[in-house]
């Protein structure tokens, strides 16, 4: 933790536990996949891949808990997961295309905070 535990709300502590667990599950997925790639025994490789898939299941259960218990996670998951097309264009689509009247440019009246355009207009 980066702040004294006694200063954190119960909600923040619960989120911390979930986020820490999610990180650990994803790290375990990586380890099992690497071990499976490096393994020369077919039966052991299948066991390692089975274990990896279980860790993915645990990670997704934790991600779902985060979605259900935190509005910020819920909003981002709704925006980015299970979408089609280029991932980097999803935000533009979700915020009205990032034009001057939407939420993605300078002086726009959108409901999101922006820092304006990164490139000068020509």
Language model regions located:
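Iron-associated oxidoreductase/ferritin-like identity signal
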Residues: 1-122
